Amino acid sequence: MSYSQQVNKRRTFAIISHPDAGKTTITEKVLLYGNAIQKAGSVKGKGSQAHAKSDWMEMEKQRGISITTSVMQFPYHDCLVNLLDTPGHEDFSEDTYRTLTAVDSCLMVIDSAKGVEERTIKLMDVTRLRDTPILTFMNKLDRDIRDPMELLDEVESVLKIRCAPITWPIGCGKLFKGVYHLYKDETYLYQSGQGHTIQDVRIVKGLNNADLDRAVGEDLARQLRDELELVKGASNEFDHDLFIRGELTPVFFGTALGNFGVDHFLDGLTQWAPAPQARQADCRLVESAEEKLTGFVFKIQANMDPKHRDRVAFMRIVSGKYEKGMKLKQVRLGKEVVLSDALTFMAGDRSHAEEAYAGDIIGLHNHGTIQIGDTFTQGEDLKFTGIPNFAPELFRRIRLKDPLKQKQLLKGLVQLSEEGAVQVFRPLTNNDLIVGAVGVLQFDVVVSRLKSEYNVEAVYETVNVATARWVECSEAKKLEEFKRKNEQNLALDGGDSLTYIAPTMVNLNLTQERYPDIQFFKTREH
């Protein structure tokens, strides 16, 4: 198979949703269809049942939430699909945001009983930064749901994206009978209690087929025909150009738990979603068709293998082909590295990659030298842009139970901050260590990982910090004066960048007014 054929058959996507909309279940079922797992594990930790394949970190198993972004690759039809699993818990936004920089399309999962929820809105804002194409799955049809037309209206008005229904539900809850495919003129009939394996679904061809009335009952069949009249008049037709531009989303209905409808959106994904896209670097646009390898690191994961204290850097290949043993340049350090043992993933199971192509995600072993945002090339000096650090919204001071372990604590915190689990700030005027996060759960994760991985017991104390901003100034003299006068509110972050830590928002606003020449940033490029 030629290089361009290999690249064109790849689809790299992530699933975005509000917590508990059913994302982990959908991930399971997607892998089942891709033959990656033969029987889907029921997701919440119910002791004896199989754990979901993508939730492999210890704390995730205990809580039944996906904390870290796993990568899973599987074949489907003629495509090779890379699914990046993003943390579903409302606290884990920074990791999730960054993962969205490494995909070419997204599946938005909505709980049909609840509609559009707050976290979905935030994540959609991030996909807008790059106009990522979105597919939508209306989940939980086996429960009582809101009116489907109302759900489409809400997506359009709240998320500012047009909806084009591809399938339409017949009944819901205990009366859920299946879905009708608007473009194939076929009805797929649902049977309950078959969520763990792939079933042969009965198909009725034609909307006016008498078999349909017999299968779902005359009342529901009549209701379906009436609703479809309305849908065809009131909703958008699918338009591929608008989809690619991120302005229109194809909508599928189903139940992930009942394993129904998942294959419909997978068909849509492989048929319509873009193959690996070009990507902007600081000096030029890098096309996926280029044969020289380039890639960027969007995530670092500690200890995927508890037996070894290793860290793995996840790299999205933008162009070219990875081959075992090849030499690459790590642009930030200007040094050459030999990649002899890159990994491919099936969440938590690692296999050594012999080759990988643009669109794929590979894992690089990292002994502390790779950071988020690092670019690797075959010699060219370029840096991919758009991999952000977000200013934390929550802060705690961290204190050791055993003061003699200061060195291990610092090492652990720096490593965890490079990995993006948390941000660390060291005030200029004292020896405090302040930890910043986007969500409360990150604090728990850090303490539990410090204990299990670095053998350090730490506790948190409240600290008088409301927000943080990275500061820069083009004139060194003015920056020095600013530092001298505001020393008590300045800190260095994990990457030694100067940061203003404000006790209140009022303080921040006043400081910004007082120093118009100093720039205050909410995000920082890695």
Swiss-Prot record:
Entry keyword Protein biosynthesis: yes
A GO term, aspect molecular function: GTP binding
Gene Ontology annotations for the cellular component aspect, listed alphabetically: cytosol
Main location: cytoplasm
Database matches in CDD domains: RF3, RF3_II, RF3_III
Single GO BP term: regulation of translational termination
Subcellular location: Cytoplasm
Highest taxon listed in the record's lineage: Bacteria
InterPro entries assigned to the protein according to its UniProt record, in alphabetical order: EF-G-like_DII, EFG_III/V, G_TR_CS, P-loop_NTPase, PrfC, RF3_C, RF3_dom_3_sf, RF3_GTP-bd
Record's keyword terms, sorted: Cytoplasm, GTP-binding, Nucleotide-binding, Protein biosynthesis
Binding-site positions, GTP: 17-24, 85-89, 139-142
Domain tr-type G: 8-277
SUPFAM superfamilies: EF-G C-terminal domain-like, P-loop containing nucleoside triphosphate hydrolases, Translation proteins
Keyword Hydrolase: no
Family per similarity comment: Belongs to the TRAFAC class translation factor GTPase superfamily. Classic translation factor GTPase family. PrfC subfamily.
Functional description taken from the UniProt entry: Increases the formation of ribosomal termination complexes and stimulates activities of RF-1 and RF-2. It binds guanine nucleotides and has strong preference for UGA stop codons. It may interact directly with the ribosome. The stimulation of RF-1 and RF-2 is significantly reduced by GTP and GDP, but not by GMP.
UniProt cross-references to NCBIfam families, sorted A to Z: prfC, PRK00741.1, small_GTP
Protein name per the record: Peptide chain release factor 3
The species this protein was found in: Histophilus somni (strain 2336)
